[in-house]
Amino acid sequence: MSTQEQVIRLMPDLFTPFTLKSVSVRNRIAMSPMTMYRSIDGKMSDFHLMLMGSRAAGGIGLVFPEQIAILPDGRTSTRCAGLWDDAQIESMSRVVQLIKDMGAVPAIQLGHTGRRGSEKKPWHGKTQLPPDDPDGWQVRGPSPFPHGRRYTLPVQQLSIPEIKEIHRAYASAARRAFQCG
């Protein structure tokens, strides 16, 4: 069977519903999480509402907004969304509800960027900002070494209590995500 025949044979499955335990998705098309750099204080904006809602209305079955930071220093930049504070629940709930209203299933990717954080937005060079910059902070990670050539800031190595703090922050962010719907 040629590759084209295989694609044609498999394509219909892409548009069929899929159920995993109690979650049913109308098709197998997913919107992966993409950092949009449009949040303020970790809160999702009307931009997120428009983007995610239009994708859900357009037929995507599973919609991930963007990586959702669990702590302020776990963001890529100051303009990234988060759920480290109850004040962020309302804005994300609006986005989640619209995704559902449009027939899609909302999903979430919680994250902490660690030593790769404190960055400028991509259209400003995507280089790291030092802690003394108004939009920068001290990056933390599992080792004191920067993550690759593009990342140049000194890294504060996480202590065991700090690792436990991040673990608790994941749990707290997950509870907030559940409250969002």
Model-derived segments and their meaning:
Residues 97, 105, 111-178:
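Non-globular sequence segments
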